[in-house]
Amino acid sequence: LKVKHEGGVVIQGASGLLIRIAKCCNPVPGDDIVGYITKGRGVAIHRQDCMNLKAQENYEQRLLDVEWEENNSTKEYTAHIDIYGLNRSGLLNDVLQVLSNTTKNISTVNAQPTKDMKFANIHVSFGIANLSMLTTVVDKIKSVPEVYSVKRTNG
C-alpha cells in the first residue's frame, strides 16, 4: 500500500505521518530520497547523500523507504545554488534574468565580491518543480558570459 503525503512524497504502507522536507539538504523531485523518523517531529525527507543525515547516531535504524509522487508538477521546492564569476558590470543582472525566465519564484539573493574585487560569489535560492528543471537553470546560468562555476548547495 502506497500512501501519498503532503510534500509530494509517497511512503509504503504508512498514513497519518507528519512529513517535512529537510532544510539541511533541500531535496527536490528527481533526487534520490529517504525518510528519517525523527523524535517527535514526524518524518524528515532527506537526499540519500545528505551528510547531516549520515552524521546521526544509528541513523540506518530510523530510515523509511520513500519516493516522490509521480506527476507532482504543482508543488514548489526550494533549491540553492552558488555562482562564481568575474565581478563585471551586469553579471548579477544577467544571472537574475535567467532565473526570472526559468523559475517561478526567487527567494533570496546574496552577492559579494571577493576581497580583491575581481570576482563575485552569488548565492541564490529559488522555487523549482523538480531536478530536471534545476539542471536546466544551472546549465543556462553556466552559459552567462564570465560565469566560471555554478553548483547546487544545501542552503
Please name every model-derived segment.
Residues 104, 117-119:
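A cross-taxa feature marking solvent-exposed loop/turn segments within ectodomains of secreted
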Residues 108:
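Acidic active-site catalytic centers that drive phospho-/nucleotidyl reactions
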Residues 95-103, 112:
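Short alpha-helical elements within RNA-binding folds
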Residues 1-92, 111-112, 117, 125, ...:
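N-terminal non-catalytic structural scaffold regions of very large proteins
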Residues 61, 101-105, 142-149:
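A common structural junction motif
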